Regions:
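Alpha-helical transmembrane segments and adjacent TM-loop junctions that form the membrane-embedded core
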Residues: 2-21, 41, 45-47, 51, ...
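First transmembrane helix
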Residues: 20-37, 133
């Protein structure tokens, strides 16, 4: 007799998809305007910010794609479905941002050697519009970013972009009142530094999740203590915790029971407590004591 247990879980992502679409439209429209004005007035600050905003649009598109493909049902080949695509997209987004930083640095060095005349008024007005666009986008993502690495990355990008636009406005005003056009290049270097700092955590966490490290939202010491404190569990071993996606986690553990007749009750307790600790997919292997093994937590 065949037995099949599906691990497919339905999560409402329609509202998040709509938010991503609105953010993409807003930012893509602004990129076209900002890049056009940057070319006309030879502003590296505007061009570098437009390039970064374009990478944000691409990142938002990738995130939207990942959320949609993650909804596909599991199959015989992808038994967890395509949920891990959200982690891969998060890692891709971090790499794209690092490439953008490299491009800004190269262009900044060129502009330092070959300075050009820049219109402070055009820079200020365009970047001022950017504050509004990026601010609205960050606000739309703010409520959704607490429990999802992809959304948090997008939110941080937009929040940083808002600050960057503030910096570009300041450089435009300095050019208007002092004529010091090199400030535009210095602002570009500052933009690159801000992007690098905001990307580092995203890159680090994405790489860790890609390598099946314990997610940062999971406190493994608390889980180990919780397992040890459940009555009827004499010892445990082979505890493994990893991320299935940027929002779902899984765990497997072997527990050694004092009384095998209490197996179902203990498994139910352990499963419930792990759910409370943000682990959604749990596999528990039960063994009767005495059980001989060399793991540190065994009896």
């Amino acid at each position: 007799m065949k037995s099949h247990h599906s691990h497919q879980h339905s999560h409402p992502v329609t509202s998040l998809n709509s938010i991503f679409i609105i953010c993409i439209i807003l930012n893509l429209s602004f990129v076209v305007v900002e890049a056009g004005i940057g070319f006309i007035y030879h502003s590296l600050g505007l061009l570098s910010d437009a390039g970064h905003n374009l990478s944000d649009v691409f990142s938002l598109l990738l995130s939207l794609f990942a959320f949609r493909i993650a909804r596909h049902r599991s199959n015989r080949h992808f038994t967890y479905g395509y949920k891990k695509s959200t982690i891969l997209v998060s890692l891709t987004n971090a790499i794209i941002l690092l490439i953008a930083v490299g491009g800004i640095l190269i262009e900044s060095i060129y502009k330092l050697r070959n300075p050009e005349q820049i219109s402070g008024e055009a820079i200020s007005w365009t970047a001022g519009t950017g504050i509004i666009v990026n601010g609205i986008t960050a606000w739309l993502l703010m409520k959704k970013q607490k429990h999802d690495l992809n959304v948090r990355g997008a939110f941080l990008h937009m929040a940083m972009d808002t600050l960057v636009s503030v910096g570009v406005v300041i450089s435009g005003l300095i050019i208007i009142y002092t004529g010091f056009t090199l400030i535009d290049t210095f602002i570009s270097l500052l933009i690159a530094l801000i992007i690098l700092l905001s990307t580092w955590r995203l890159l680090k966490e994405s790489m860790c999740l890609s390598l099946d490290a314990v997610p940062s939202s999971i406190h493994i010491n608390e889980i180990e203590k919780m397992i040890s404190n459940i009555p009827g569990i004499q010892s445990w071993h082979h505890l493994h915790i990893w991320a299935i996606s940027t929002t779902e986690n899984a765990a497997t553990v072997h527990i050694v029971l004092e009384d095998i007749r209490q197996m179902e009750n203990i498994k139910q307790q352990l499963r419930h407590k792990m759910h409370e600790m943000n682990i959604q997919h749990i596999t528990i292997e039960c063994e009767a004591c005495p059980y001989i093994c060399n793991e540190p937590h065994c009896c």
